[in-house]
Amino acid sequence: MKLRVHNTLSGLKEEFFPLSSEVVRMYVCGPTVYDVPHIGNIRASVVYDIVYRVLLKLFPEVIYVRNITDVDDKIITAASVRGVKCDKVALHYEHIFHEHLGLLNCLSPTVEPKATQNIGKMISMIQALIDNGNAYSVGGNVYFDVGSFAEYGVLSKRKKEQLVYGVRVEKDVDKKHPGDFILWKSDDHVYWPSPWGNGRPGWHIECSAMTLATLGADFDIHGGGADLKFPHHENERAQSMCANPGSQFARYWVHNGFLTVNGEKMSKSLGNVVNVDTLVESGVTPNVIRFVLISTHYSKPLDWNDAMVGEAINSLIKFKLALLDSGVLPKSKSHIGSLNIGVCSDNAEDEEVDPRSCASEVIVARNKRKAKNFSKKMNEIFNKFGGLGDDCSIYTREFFECMADDFNTPGAIAVLHKLSDGVRLVGAEKVNNLAHLLYNLLIFLGIDLGVRQSSVSEDFIRSQLQKRADCKRQKDFVEADRIRFALAKMGVLIRDHKHAPTDWVSL
């Protein structure tokens, strides 16, 4: 199956040809760990988790690198405010980041290098840029000379004159041009020794050095949020190509769209910053969060709002009912149990490792093993369904055609709705295969409906059902409906039956 990817560099949807047919190399800009990640940060991680899953399905091996920026002005400020060291702040928020991605069932990247573990490589790259005539040192600072790179602006589709003279930049009399950017910042507070004096690296050089260290001078895919296209990715591309003459750096650039909340940009001043913890505390399950994030094409803007959450809940309830009614999920455990039918899990027991060594050989080997297990299991399952020669083959093909068409998750979800409808319409002899296919396609997307995630207790649900029954007897249907809708927002579906007691299904 051919994979097509929208390449920001060309502005076109292109057929994907990796440098090697045996291994795909992908780098994604990870978090700057100074605060709890908001849902916009998490969207990017979920997007590239989907990309990773598709690549694992289509290619023998994938090396997925996502960095951790653990030295930055924002981290230094946060540490100063708290009166602690920078590494304590960084480790704390790195842990929360990983915790949130674990809740959303994201596969671990192959390698997760940290900026502070690669300072020497950054210094070497900066020296190479100076030697090649692309950078200059002034007063302990080192700047990249944007005028020395003819392709500057190609990625972000901006004219060099606009970039150099038209953008808003810091006033710095040491710069040759207003658009020149920092490679090494002189600092005697948080610093490392260098040929130019004590200081620390600029943000852009960090990713360039870590891609070179983990993937080499040329690799296949570079991903990140649309907000990183300029200046971060433009600068990263410039310094990497100049430090490694003849290199093309990343061949395909992929950018995910912005995320807003109720039509507005997230802001602490507006009080509308949303993160995984606050959503889960409000009753939104991790499966629902993930489903909302993949329900819009990765490249498009996504607005987080109650309507989107409601649509996700309705879809997942529909899928779960199809799985319950088919017997794939046992009805006796529909709200409290889990089911293992031989699909991949990312929750295998891990070796004891030093949490400060995210790029250690042990962790890399573990992550490669998990990715290989996921790829093997998924291919075994879908080769089986794809070879049945019936509706299963059709749905399997349609689903993966969508996923191979620029990671079209909305199209793939539409196939799931058709498949779910099919589970209810076909004869008994076909139900089992179709329902198992539905379950496994959801697993491929990172959604496991076999595990109850709702934090709403059974006692609370029963008490609400009793209140609702009392309201109906008293003909207070407005309040009865309010209770029903309130439970639905928490992922609990009430089912009324003509000749049987009311029951419920929980996500």
From Swiss-Prot:
Organism: Neorickettsia sennetsu (strain ATCC VR-367 / Miyayama) (Ehrlichia sennetsu)
Pfam families associated with the record: DALR_2 (PF09190), tRNA-synt_1e (PF01406)
Superkingdom in the source lineage: Bacteria
CDD domains (UniProt xref): CysRS_core
Cofactor note: Binds 1 zinc ion per subunit.
Reactions this protein catalyses: tRNA(Cys) + L-cysteine + ATP = L-cysteinyl-tRNA(Cys) + AMP + diphosphate
Name the UniProt record assigns to this protein: Cysteine--tRNA ligase
Highest classification ranks of the organism: Bacteria, Pseudomonadati, Pseudomonadota, Alphaproteobacteria, Rickettsiales
Residues reported to bind ATP: K268
One annotated GO biological process: cysteinyl-tRNA aminoacylation
Subunit organization: Monomer.
Motif 'KMSKS' region in this chain: 265-269
PANTHER family, per database record: CYSTEINE--TRNA LIGASE, CYTOPLASMIC, CYSTEINYL-TRNA SYNTHETASE
Sequence motif: 'HIGH' region, positions: 31-41
Cofactor needs: Zn(2+)
Keyword Cell membrane: no
